[in-house]
């Protein structure tokens, strides 16, 4: 009969520690395993695919238990972190063999989604940002950090719109918030399955202030203090590598909201969710992990300062002109490891011997990189060469101290080079001489006993011993051999001489290992003192890496240097190409297009059949702008561009069902973002606005939006539409120009030219698109007959309402032109159906329904 057991001292200790971390999985170290208990064990066994067992199985209340081996713990932690959980690592704080009573245990680190510094394969070029948000009367103080690299930045945001843009740009998984947070703010911040972590009012940190003297805004200082208090409380170790907070303004960069980033496939492909076939993947010829991260930042935050853009362009041009020097630079960069994260591991105390060798190898490349900079022409490179600190003292220290091929463990010896420390060398000599003595003893015992198979062995349990097979036991001399252990086929013995020598050897080995670890810690501390120098060098190398990447891609893809101008918003792109589509199709297969929008053109109204390339044309301009303002060369024959402050997009259909929003609601929300926030210096891309609702509603909204943008916003706008009636707006809107994607019919077949031409499209090609999709010939013939009948019966097509006189007030988006009444409901339905906007399946379903109604009659 099971018996109820009282709480054991160990479970009492576990429960006391668990109570301090109720929202985390507690990994409780017992020997070589981390154990999970109770609810943690039940949930952990499911998530981690562990065997669920129990402690005290015979009791009425057995305790659920599951465990993971200590050497593989990180992989299990990563799984829980990926699911959005926190993990508290509880270690044994003393040697169990020497402990009196219960072994002391304590949580040494709380790993969270925003603080995980273990970088998985394939993620080296990505940041893991943790953010902090502190609402105040005028907006939101906002800070973010990457614990693995030491980056720390802060700003003050004036609106929820600005806050959402920053959160999406950083792709943060965890947000630190104060205790007092409204439900409205909490709901907004949790979008995208972000984890909210509450940090009570923070006292100044014991490590010193992370707030620089230049940071004078009290709200910004407070949010930095809150974030750093959380990091220090969770990491429970030195964060000396985290730099003082740098203030920034999002408005100092080209701003893009979440929709623009997604629609343009800048960092992530919107269709696959992966990084392939994106602007980032195309431009990434970086050789270092830190260069890859900086490239993402440059693409995510293109510049507004025309002088800063020019500096980058000059550097790219110089590298482009010096092929051999660029090749030498690339060769050296491939041997540079992740200096930022190596510095972080040094500060964390998790650096090992192999990490230090990687650091030394990286630093050894710097003199050669400086030589390359000296051969380039641009003055900024020569200035960089003189400022670049090779940190040669750290490289020299590691070269003198650390074995070239050290073990992973830092506690088992074998790390420190001979000659670095005399005392360590003497211990090693003692061990070497003693082992020689052991070998000589083995030879003499074999000779004395006549047992040729006699061996002197060692293991951690019994130490040194003499092993003799049972067939030779009769040859053992009496009185001198003391039996130690009996095996199936052998006996193990010790002798007084062997026991004495064992003590000397083990003492020397233990002293050697302890001294070696102390020496390694001292070396680590010396490197830690130079972290700021290493971080400065990392920033310089990262920038060089991105610049050479831009130059390499420009050369391979035949990009040109764009001309940037301020003061006007004129666009002159000739022979422009969509960089990613061109890469996929091949340059010879891609058809380039011009985008000409001077002072008398604010809007291009784009018409043409589906699948003809309207969306590609629109995205092409936006990507060229982003590349140019990031400092890259661009895919065009000529590119003369203004400086844009924001990009807004509405491209493609997408529901947000998780938030209860239909395609049309998403469409209107995205349109409203541009209408509310765009300026005359912005770029707007609207694709098929109004298609998510009924025809007349959609056309009315599209026309009203066009008029509002034209009359009130004055931003450069590319607006594609399937409402051909809207093309007549060019008669009343002076700065609207019609363009269309060319297509020709050859022998009854439609051929897309993928070329943008002036003027509106002269007809719809919906039936031809349906033919390309492979719909049945009879169905297509019937659709063609219906179309001709419609065109004959309804010669007076619905025209757009006259454009109103421009007034300095917001236009109503919900006043639509009244539809012309029809005699037949079926004809009314036909008149409203736009074949060009329909997919082949839409057309087939429509014709099927139409036939059903006619047959009933």
Swiss-Prot record:
CDD domains the UniProt entry points to: ABC_MutS1 (cd03284)
InterPro entries with a match to the protein in the record: DNA_mismatch_repair_MutS, DNA_mismatch_repair_MutS-lik_N, DNA_mismatch_repair_MutS/MSH, DNA_mismatch_repair_MutS_C, DNA_mismatch_repair_MutS_clamp, DNA_mismatch_repair_MutS_core, DNA_mismatch_repair_MutS_N, DNA_mismatch_repair_MutS_sf
Gene Ontology biological-process entries: mismatch repair
GO CC term, one of those recorded: cytosol
Coiled coil: none
Short name of any one Pfam family annotated for the protein: MutS_II
Superkingdom of this protein's organism: Bacteria
SUPFAM superfamilies, A to Z: DNA repair protein MutS, domain I, DNA repair protein MutS, domain II, DNA repair protein MutS, domain III, P-loop containing nucleoside triphosphate hydrolases
Gene3D superfamilies referenced in this protein's UniProt entry, alphabetically: 1.10.1420.10, DNA repair protein MutS, domain I (3.40.1170.10), MutS, connector domain (3.30.420.110), P-loop containing nucleotide triphosphate hydrolases (3.40.50.300)
Keywords attached to this entry: ATP-binding, DNA damage, DNA repair, DNA-binding, Nucleotide-binding
SMART domains assigned: MUTSac, MUTSd
Binding site for ATP: 608-615
Record GO terms (molecular function): ATP binding; ATP-dependent DNA damage sensor activity; damaged DNA binding; mismatched DNA binding
Biological function: This protein is involved in the repair of mismatches in DNA. It is possible that it carries out the mismatch recognition step. This protein has a weak ATPase activity.
Family: Belongs to the DNA mismatch repair MutS family.
Protein name per its UniProtKB record: DNA mismatch repair protein MutS
Organism: Lacticaseibacillus casei (strain BL23) (Lactobacillus casei)
